[in-house]
Every structure is written in structure tokens, then in C-alpha cells.
């Protein structure tokens, strides 16, 4: 028989045991779980970005928890592991997409027990993984939240290099005060998400998915905004309750948009937009009739 308190306690304890054994590189990288004392009306399962950790969803997760919802942000496979990682000794990140897919499926099974409606979301490559789930299991998910999803990069030459080079890449912003993850990664570990992004765009043309909120920024130098729009337009045909928001260049919101330490000085815009979307039944047509400023100003 299902017992909510026992289940949530087990989720927390199992994650702690697993991460203690890694060992964890920084306490910020640990899985984040925010559980109400009883099953919640809404449950949010979030996937963090590439080489990063659950800390990216702390601000949004805390806002949703305060609104009365359950939040799960599990540490992804091969992430957050302590070690002296570099080009000669790269972090042990998966190079088989099935590792991430199985991970996502296991967590969706756990999360859907904890409330009435399940929302799945992700940032960057975590958004790619969430989009895959939205296409694979739309019947289990109420809505999907994609923040700067990595469907491909801004530069086609870089995409081509990602496809062919087996090298190690070090992040240019590795010294960012909001970064507690790896400073670099082996290119093949990113390639699998590039391939998945291409498949998601192709499948979106004829595969039903959940309603989606897709969030972009004109200052994002890592992802392709045109492909965010392409995905939105494809999903909108079947799911009229999908929304799209692209933050203006004047706001200088970078790809790392999920927290202020990572560079988003207008984080309230993202949080308020997300809360408005998950609590609304408005269609995109209705939003457009109200005026684009209804989203832009989160009124």
C-alpha cells in the first residue's frame, strides 16, 4: 500500500546514500527535493543543465514549493562527482543517451505518485530531455516547461565540430560564481543531446506531445532561437495551451537563465511567467488577444 510520507523519506534517503558514495563535488550539486506534508495538487520534476547540478532550479523550485507544490530536481548520471577533471581525465559523463532516458523514466514513475498533476521541465540539455519525455509519455504529463532547450547551437560550424571531434572542451564561463558543476566536458557527451534535439524537432511535425512553455532569450549565445520557435509552432498545432516567451536583448538574460548568480538579473520575470503558465488554462490565441504585454509584464 502506498504511503506518502514513507515514499518521500525514501526518495531523500536513497539520493543521499547514492550521492555520498560518488562522492559529491559540492553540496550544491546534491539532488533537491521540496515535499509538502501531504500529496500536492501539482508535482514538478526538473532536469538541470549539462555539467551542472540541481542548484540551478533552487529559485524556481522554492517559489513553486511556496505555492503549495512538490518539487523534485534529481542529480543526473555522471554529474556532480568530485575529482580532478581535465582534458586528460575528463568527468565520467554518459555518452549513451539511453542512460539519460532510463534515468528520466525512473524519475517520472516516482514523481507521478506524489500529487495529482505532473509537470516536467528542464533547462538547456535538461530541457531536451524534458521535451523527449513530452513526446514519449504525453498521457502522464500535464504540461512541459522548457527553459532555453538545447536543440542545436547558435553556430552551425560549432554543431558540426560537436558531431565529429572527440575532444575535451572547457567552459568559457567556468569561473562564474554561480557555477558549481564541471569546468569542462568531453565533446561526445554533448553530441548525444544534439542528436536528440534533431530528433525532437523532426518528430514534433507529426508526434503529439504535451502543452509546452518554451522560454528563450535573445541574448542566449548557446542555443538556436529559431528552433525554439519551430518547436513551439509545431506543438501549438496540437496543443493550443502552449506558450512561448523570448526575453528581449535589452534585458541581457544569458543562456544560464535559471538563477541570478548565473547571470539572470530579471529572475522574477521567469518565475512569474512559469507560475502564470502552470496555473492558467489560457490558450495562446487568448494570450495574443490580451496583448503580448500580458506575458511580457507577467500581469
Predicted features along the sequence, with ranges:
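Active-site nucleophile loop of the alpha/beta-hydrolase fold
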Residues: 145-156
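Catalytic nucleophile-loop/oxyanion-hole region of alpha/beta-hydrolase
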Residues: 83-114
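A catalytic-pocket lid/entrance helix-loop region that shapes and gates access to the active site
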Residues: 157-179
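Serine-hydrolase catalytic core
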Residues: 37-38, 185-254, 263-298
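Gly/Ala-rich beta-loop-alpha elbow adjacent to hydrolase catalytic centers
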Residues: 121-126, 130
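Short, surface-exposed "cap/lid" segments of acyl-processing enzymes
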Residues: 25-79
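N-terminal cap/lid segment of alpha/beta-hydrolase-fold proteins
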Residues: 1-39
